[in-house]
Amino acid sequence: MTAKRIPATVRLEAILAEVENNGHASVSDIAERLGVSEMTIRRDMDKLGAEGHVVRTHGGAHSNDDLRSKASEMIEPSVENRATRNRSEKKRIAASAVRLIEPRSTVAIDVGTTCFELASLISDSTVHIVCASLPIQRVLAKNQMQIYAPCGRIAGADPSTVGAQTVAYLRDFRFEIAFLAVAGITEDGLFDYSFEDAEIKKTLAMQAHSRVLMLDSSKVGKSSAVRVMGFDSIDVLITDAPLPPEMAAVLADLNVDVVLAP
């Protein structure tokens, strides 16, 4: 029987759809379904494998879950997703962090859901708080706190001010303590989703006497698009579970104090 002439785009889409739906695609099954030769489908799968869309196996291909997982780490989750994810752990971390704030101190608070939980707990009206996050500014204003709001361009699904004006404003401050949050950490350091957010975090760290990273354990071992800084730029890490031994050793060598939130 002569094999049909099926456009390459149709064949490739059929393979990807099978992998997406079932996790695996068989050369013989796809060839039979489309009425083309197995050699043609093998070449198509080789192409998809070389491009990283699938993992080539003997007789077929399966989904590249590792690639999909890595790609998802580069994309910032929605505000709604982050607000509900590991919320109890974030509350515990925030409860430990708020104890570090001294009366009449000047404090910097980064953006993010853990930082929001921290801001919700601050009740000392003698504390001066600098924060670029609009949602955090609102919760602080509701609690009648002393807030300094940087100028700049508003950006992000979790809106905050960013850009050169924001950085210049922050550089005029000296903070007793800065509370930072990132998308993830590996042994190579701290990572986040965008260059603009990373620049704000670097500035807060540079202007602070003490730098506290608040991070729930789901972010340990996760990288993202932009490396923000190394562990030598923080003094305290507050998390909710013990770190992997290798990472704990790196932090110990740098004299970073690791606090497990009760």
Give, region by region, the residue ranges found by the protein language model:
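Conserved phosphate- and dinucleotide-binding cores of soluble alpha/beta proteins
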Residues: 2-28, 35-38, 50, 56, ...
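Short glycine/serine/threonine-rich phosphate/pyrophosphate-binding segments
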Residues: 114-118, 220-223
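A residue-level structural signature of the nucleotidyltransferase/glycosyltransferase Rossmann-like core
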Residues: 128-129, 177
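Glycine-rich N-terminal segment of FAD-binding domains in flavoprotein oxidoreductases
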Residues: 107, 111-113
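HTH-adjacent hinge/linker in prokaryotic transcriptional regulators
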Residues: 2-34, 39, 43-107, 119-124, ...
